[in-house]
């Protein structure tokens, strides 16, 4: 208790808060778990996999190698925390939900990740929304991003990454919806705007300036609606060694519109057009349009050869289209399916490695699809069309209303998927692992990197392996070595990591972002996770599987149940579907991309060749799969071995014993899906002969023979004529050995040949060797050599001729081909029917034998005729089936095979020596002539020479095989030792890491317990200590203080009394002196004045405001009231006096005015009478003068006036008649055309009266009546008068239009009758009148077509007569407008 009371409470409290990190969010998964168990008020957040309690988190090791845990886990939930604990979180399940961290929300104050390095490039404000296209395009040389100018016009800014030079691209309609470079090394920049206009620029740098050249510009019609969802997709660039210009390969791209997709060939466009822009409506070739989706097309992808387009739409479908740009064929839908059960799709990514393209790896093997703005991602296998993995993103519990809006992008190596959330300031990096051989791909880890702002769009420039400290980019060869070293050493000794370089568009700026982190170092167990519906016997691979030395490792160290050494006990798993084997009928029908090309005379390059091709994803129909099951599985020896080896490799456990040396493996019978076929397989070590995947291993025979059936709906690969099979009698018997030294020698010679060794890198070896049924160790030590076996069996004779026939009853064995020289020699010597039975018997005990196959009854060609060309170059040591088989003059039946005609003539003669050489010699001498004997001697000599050559070849071959086997064994032992040492070191490091992690977890647990103990003690002691201190202080402190202060108080009182007495006397004396002093008096007076000045002023002010002002205000108010009353009274009195005065004044004026008026009236009368008299006098005199002058003038001008008047009257009358005739005709036509809508007045007014009436109506605002009256008069001048009087904007600027539809139609018709005069006024009114026509009005619908057609004809005549008029442009535009309305 004493120690607790002596604690510094405030310091302990702050220390405890610092330990528990109560002032900031926790960043430890274990602390979060402990705090969530103890108190929910702590701020720690859960990181990693949910569902484990406190003790589980402390005691269970979170290793990714625990296959038992993985085997039972189908779903997984990952809660990200926003700190370094959210980097490389392992993914272990097929269905994974990733929950965003709280710190990633926009309103969070958390800082960005320290793994992210940001450098600003440009400052610009982009609108915060989800952009379906790209705002930025990145290449190794240039950077382009879309912006808006001051007048809201879209532009593209181009930056040179090395020289920081800038350029601006303009000329867009609406906003830029998508832009992209053809590839990273390309200078071709493609762009599409909201109107669908396509731009392709060629960017070059000259004298530190960026030069942009438009090489393609496709322009859409002006009435094209704007759409912000248009996309631009380039055809992927596949670099080739012989490519001189990479830009020539990138000449195909796709445009995605709302309702269609277009594929454009830039070569055809550039060859057919030399000037740009070009209207899309004028193009007839160079592109193809694809329609077929019910909703908006959101994503697309072109195959590398440009023959297949994959589209994803909001209707939920992904469709594959076969396209023919140059031909007349329409695009064909090859396959369609809904990957997300009808949800709108937003992502379509094919996992192809374009950074390091392997010609043996097929394209489009795996596919990533996304729905609902990539809230859900799925990994698909395009061979079996099965979903391999599902990833779902969900918001954190504090922001459930803000759903993720993700944009996804794969790097060129297809190893990392990068995602940005528009609604959160975060970047996700997901690691992707692919296994082409096993047909599996999955995401293995996810990393979260916090940013300062949300990313609206980004472009990945490079993903490479870099040094940890110096961020030095490793070269490709060191990168692969580093990857291997990291896989063996683990995360604790990793020296390198992944560096991602990308450019991000934020809401406030464009930034250069670099991310460095160490990838997931766990095993690849997530790649082999069981799917729903998989077989029960499926087991996960051990971590030793990656070393390829499982045959030499101990099975006792693993925790797997069951023996994995016995290959016959391994449950067979279904191999991935391929066109080499029939697929189930339930799979959708889809042709291979190779089959989409036009059939040619030769087969295209297969995936096993040097050329790259697409993954074969075609499924066969149910009828063909059943009917052709046996044929497809028994096409050729090479094909059959590939198929069975592929399925066997997928089914077998990686810990099974691998045979180190070819030819020494066990004979294992594996039943394919279609019985009764079985094969004797031998396991080949992957380190000696690399295994090929089912999709890429193709024998040359299949490639050379399958060239004619690729254009069918169900592609059928042509096979060799060789068929394989075994009879049902020996289906359950042990492996049957057919030793053939010649076949074995030829096979081994083929293995050792340079062509065979080089071709082994890309496909399975055509070598097919049997194996003896002995143990591996006995095989290595007790196997006789080839020559020893041959020599020991040489004298066996015909006694062993029935060994093979006793247990085997099948067709003639297919022997390897021999050289042309040996074949010709044997043919010339007539040994086409020689027997090989004795040679077989002579090598019956050899472990090297050739696997046998059936020749069907319909075979009529040589089994070796379809061998590839490199087989003919091998100098075989055995007879070919072409000399002894169907090419012979006869074919032996099966029952005669016991005495095989293929045996050597020399062996026949040796077998007949015992029957008596003397009788045979005598018979020969008696029956044959000397000439026949010479021929036989020559034949014997030639055969002896051949046998000697064969023996010498066998000796050479034995030496080569022995040296090769020694080298192989030494290399195998070195590999095994190295692998075992590496595995031992890895296990040791793993144990050390486990111990360190256990100690760290224990230490963390102890720290947590100490923290909680301190907190508990603090909480309990603080309350109790405070209560105790208060009670003790209340009881003891006041009493103690009073007791100690009593004597002090008495002493102080006496001392103070004495002091006060002395001070009082001195004070009185001094005060008296001071008061009597003049200075003091003055000072006091000044001080009093200064002191009293302020209070007096305030008192006066307050008194004035509170007393004087109210009294004065009341006095003024009463005074003003009295003044007002007096003024009113005086005013009334004045008014009365004024009225009386005015009345008196008026009366006096009236009295004086009457006599004056009478006098004026008299004067006016007199003046009028005098004026009348004067007027009559003047008129008479003037009229007489005027008449006299007129008579004189008329006499002189009468003739000239008559002549002029006649001419003028005649011209005016004729012109008036013509105008009247035209007006009458026009009125009649107008009355006939607009009889239904145009009223005709009963009586015509004259022109002036009509003008006055119309003007009056216009002044009154009755526009419709004014125009109707003018149009009813059938006078164009009157109509023009109305148009001139009132402006067109005053008429048509009102809404709705004051003119009726009938008046509008009549106005359009009359104004268009003559466009040669007053053209500007007429066209102006015509434009406005046409724009105000109501298409829904029945009168307009009935008469609009005829009226507008007439107007178009008048406009056409006007343009023909005066094409260069200033009004021709407006007239042409009006005619285009009328054309659209007429067609509408």
UniProtKB/Swiss-Prot annotation:
Point out the coiled-coil segments of this chain. Answer: 930-1012
Q: Where in the cell is it found?
A: Cytoplasm, P-body; Nucleus
Q: Which GO terms describe its biological process?
A: deadenylation-independent decapping of nuclear-transcribed mRNA
Positions of region (Disordered): 471-494, 551-584, 796-931
Amino acid composition bias (Basic and acidic residues), ranges on this chain: 834-844
InterPro entries per record: EDC4-like, EDC4_C, EDC4_C_sf, EDC4_WD40, WD40/YVTN_repeat-like_dom_sf, WD40_repeat_dom_sf, WD40_rpt
The keyword Disulfide bond appears for this protein = no
Q: Where are the WD repeats?
A: 171-211, 227-274, 292-331, 340-390
Q: Which PROSITE patterns match?
A: WD_REPEATS_2, WD_REPEATS_REGION
This protein's UniProt keywords: Coiled coil, Cytoplasm, Nucleus, Repeat, WD repeat
Q: Would you tell me the Gene Ontology cellular component terms?
A: nucleus; P-body
What Pfam families does the entry give? EDC4_C, Ge1_WD40
The cross-references to SMART domains, in alphabetical order and at most eight, read:
WD40
Return the Polar residues bias intervals: 482-494, 854-866, 918-931
Q: Which domain of life is it from?
A: Eukaryota
Q: Does the keyword Membrane apply?
A: no
The principal location of this protein is cytoplasm
Q: What biological function has been recorded for the protein in this entry?
A: In the process of mRNA degradation, seems to play a role in mRNA decapping.
Instruction: Please report which protein family the annotation says this sequence is part of.
Output: Belongs to the WD repeat EDC4 family.
Q: What is this protein called?
A: Enhancer of mRNA-decapping protein 4
Which organism was this protein described from?
Danio rerio (Zebrafish)
């Amino acid at each position: 208790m004493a120690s607790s009371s002596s604690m510094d409470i405030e310091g302990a409290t702050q220390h405890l808060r610092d330990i528990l990190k109560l002032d900031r969010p926790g960043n430890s998964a274990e602390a979060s778990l402990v705090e969530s168990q103890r108190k929910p008020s702590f701020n720690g957040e859960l990181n990693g996999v949910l569902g484990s309690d406190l003790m589980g988190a402390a005691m269970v090791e979170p290793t990714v190698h625990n296959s038992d845990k993985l085997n039972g886990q189908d779903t997984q939930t990952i809660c990200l925390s926003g700190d370094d604990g959210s980097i490389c979180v392992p993914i272990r399940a097929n269905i994974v939900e990733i929950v965003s961290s709280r710190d990633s929300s926009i309103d969070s104050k958390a800082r960005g990740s320290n793994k992210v390095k940001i450098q600003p490039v440009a400052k610009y404000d982009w609108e915060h929304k989800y952009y379906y296209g790209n705002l930025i395009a990145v290449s190794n040389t240039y950077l382009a991003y879309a912006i808006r100018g001051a007048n809201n016009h879209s532009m593209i800014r181009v930056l040179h990454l090395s020289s920081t030079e800038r350029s601006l691209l303009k000329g867009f309609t609406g906003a830029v919806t998508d832009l992209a470079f053809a590839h990273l090394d390309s200078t071709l920049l493609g762009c599409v705007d909201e109107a669908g206009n396509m731009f392709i620029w060629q960017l070059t740098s000259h004298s530190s300036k960026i030069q942009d050249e438009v090489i393609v510009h496709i322009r859409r019609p002006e009435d094209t609606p704007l759409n912000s969802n248009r996309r631009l997709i380039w055809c992927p660039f596949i670099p080739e060694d012989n490519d001189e210009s990479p830009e020539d390969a990138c000449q195909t791209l796709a445009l995605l519109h709302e309702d269609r997709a277009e594929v454009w060939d830039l070569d055809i466009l550039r060859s057919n057009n030399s000037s740009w822009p070009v209207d899309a409506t004028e193009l007839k070739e160079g592109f193809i349009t694809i329609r077929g989706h019910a909703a908006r097309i959101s994503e697309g992808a072109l195959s590398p050869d440009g023959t297949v387009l994959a589209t994803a739409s909001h209707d939920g479908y992904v469709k594959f289209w076969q396209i023919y740009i140059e031909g007349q064929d329409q695009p064909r839908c090859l396959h369609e399916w809904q990957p997300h059960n009808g949800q709108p799709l937003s992502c379509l990514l094919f996992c192809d490695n374009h950074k390091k393209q392997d010609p043996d790896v097929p394209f489009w093997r795996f596919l990533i699809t996304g729905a609902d703005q990539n809230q859900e991602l799925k990994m698909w296998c395009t061979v079996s069309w099965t979903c391999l993995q599902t990833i779902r993103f969900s918001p954190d519990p504090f922001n459930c209303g803000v759903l993720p809006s993700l944009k996804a992008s794969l790097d060129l190596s297809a190893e990392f998927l990068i995602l940005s959330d528009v609604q959160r300031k975060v970047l996700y990096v997901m690691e992707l692992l692919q296994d082409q051989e096993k047909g599996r791909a999955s995401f293995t880890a996810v990393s979260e990197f916090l940013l300062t702002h949300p990313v609206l769009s980004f472009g990945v420039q490079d993903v490479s392996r870099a040094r940890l400290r110096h961020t030095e980019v490793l070269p490709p060869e060191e990168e692969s070595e580093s990857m291997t070293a990291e896989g063996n050493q683990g995360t604790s000794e990793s020296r390198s990591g992944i560096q991602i370089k990308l450019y991000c568009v934020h809401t406030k700026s464009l930034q250069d972002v670099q991310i460095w982190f160490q990838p997931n170092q766990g095993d690849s167990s997530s790649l082999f996770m069981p799917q729903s519906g998989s077989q029960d016997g499926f087991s996960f691979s051990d971590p030793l599987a990656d070393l390829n030395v499982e045959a030499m490792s101990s099975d006792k160290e693993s925790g797997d149940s069951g023996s994995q050494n016995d290959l016959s006990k391994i449950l067979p798993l279904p191999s991935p579907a391929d066109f080499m084997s029939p697929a189930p009928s339930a799979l959708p029908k889809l042709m291979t991309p190779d089959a989409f090309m036009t059939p040619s005379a030769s087969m295209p390059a297969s995936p096993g060749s040097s050329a790259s091709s697409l993954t074969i994803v075609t499924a066969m129909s149910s009828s063909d799969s059943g009917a052709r099951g046996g044929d497809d599985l028994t096409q050729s020896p090479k094909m059959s071995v590939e198929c069975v080896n592929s399925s066997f490799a997928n089914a077998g456990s990686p810990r099974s014993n691998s045979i180190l040396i070819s030819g020494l493996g066990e004979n294992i019978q594996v039943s394919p899906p279609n019985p009764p076929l079985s094969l004797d397989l031998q396991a080949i070590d992957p380190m000696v002969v690399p295994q090929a995947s089912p999709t890429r291993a193709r024998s040359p025979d299949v490639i050379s023979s399958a060239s004619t059936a690729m254009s069918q709906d169900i592609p059928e690969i042509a096979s060799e004529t060789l068929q394989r099979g075994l009879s049902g009698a020996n289906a359950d018997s042990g492996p049957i050995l057919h030793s053939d030294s010649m076949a074995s020698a030829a096979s081994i010679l083929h293995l050792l040949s340079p062509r065979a060794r080089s071709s082994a890198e890309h496909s399975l070896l055509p070598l097919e060797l049997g194996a003896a049924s002995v143990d591996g160790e006995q095989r290595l030590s007790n196997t006789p050599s080839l020559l020893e076996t041959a020599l020991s069996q040489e004298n066996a004779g015909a006694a062993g001729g029935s060994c093979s026939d006793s247990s085997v009853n099948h067709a003639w064995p297919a022997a390897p081909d021999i050289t042309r020289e040996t074949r010709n020699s044997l043919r010339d010597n007539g040994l086409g029917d020689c027997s090989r039975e004795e040679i077989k018997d002579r090598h019956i005990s050899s472990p090297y034998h050739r696997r046998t196959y059936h020749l069907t009854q319909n075979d009529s060609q040589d089994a070796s005729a379809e061998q590839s060309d490199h087989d003919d170059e091998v100098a075989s040591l055995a007879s070919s089936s072409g000399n002894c088989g169907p090419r012979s003059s006869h074919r032996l039946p099966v029952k005669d095979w016991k005495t095989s005609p293929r045996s050597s003539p020399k062996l026949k003669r040796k077998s007949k020596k015992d029957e008596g050489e003397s009788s045979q010699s005598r018979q020969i001498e008696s029956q044959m002539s000397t000439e026949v004997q010479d021929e036989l001697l020559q034949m014997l000599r030639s055969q002896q020479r051949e046998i000697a050559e064969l023996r010498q070849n066998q000796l050479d071959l034995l030496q080569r095989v022995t040296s090769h086997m020694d080298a192989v064994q030494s290399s195998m032992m070195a590999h095994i030792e190295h692998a075992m040492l590496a595995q031992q070191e890895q296990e040791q490091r793993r144990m050390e890491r486990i111990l360190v992690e256990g100690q760290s977890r224990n230490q963390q647990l102890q720290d947590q317990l100490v923290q909680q103990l301190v907190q508990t003690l603090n909480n309990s002691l603080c309350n109790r200590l405070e209560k105790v201190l208060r009670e003790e202080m209340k009881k003891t402190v006041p009493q103690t203080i009073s007791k100690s202060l009593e004597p002090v108080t008495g002493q102080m009182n006496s001392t103070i009394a004495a002091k006060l007495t002395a001070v009082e006397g001195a004070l009185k004396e001094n005060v008296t002196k001071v008061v009597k002093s003049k200075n003091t008096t003055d000072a006091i007076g000044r001080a009093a004045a200064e002191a009293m000045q302020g209070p007096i002023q305030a008192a006066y002010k307050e008194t004035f405001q509170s007393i004087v002002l109210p009294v004065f205000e009341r006095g003024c108010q009463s005074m003003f009231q009295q003044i007002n009353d007096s003024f009113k009274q005086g005013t009334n009195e004045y008014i009365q006096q004024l009225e009386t005065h005015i009345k008196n004044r008026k009366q006096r004026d009236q009295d004086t005015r009457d006599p004056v008026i009478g006098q004026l009236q008299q004067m006016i009368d007199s003046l009028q009478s005098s004026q009348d008299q004067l007027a009559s006098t003047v008129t008479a005199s003037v009229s007489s003068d005027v008449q006299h002058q007129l008579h004189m003038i008329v006499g002189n001008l009468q003739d000239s006036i008559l002549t002029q008047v006649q001419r003028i009257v005649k011209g005016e009358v004729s012109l008036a008649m013509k105008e009247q005739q035209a007006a009458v005709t026009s009125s009649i036509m107008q009355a006939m055309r607009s009889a239904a809508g145009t009223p005709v007045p009963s009586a015509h007014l004259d022109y002036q009266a009509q003008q006055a009436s119309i003007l009056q109506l216009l002044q009154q605002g009755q526009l419709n009546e004014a125009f109707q009256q003018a149009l009813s008069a059938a006078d164009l001048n009157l109509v023009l008068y109305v148009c001139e009087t009132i402006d067109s904007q005053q008429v048509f600027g009102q809404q709705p239009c004051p003119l009726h539809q009938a008046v509008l139609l009549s106005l359009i018709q009359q104004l268009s009758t003559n466009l040669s005069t007053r053209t500007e006024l007429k066209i102006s009114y015509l434009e406005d009148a046409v724009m105000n026509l109501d298409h829904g009005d029945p009168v307009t619908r009935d008469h609009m077509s005829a009226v507008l057609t007439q107007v178009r004809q008048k406009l056409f005549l006007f343009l023909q007569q005066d094409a260069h008029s200033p009004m021709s442009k407006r007239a042409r535009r009006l005619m285009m407008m009328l054309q659209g309305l007429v067609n509408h």
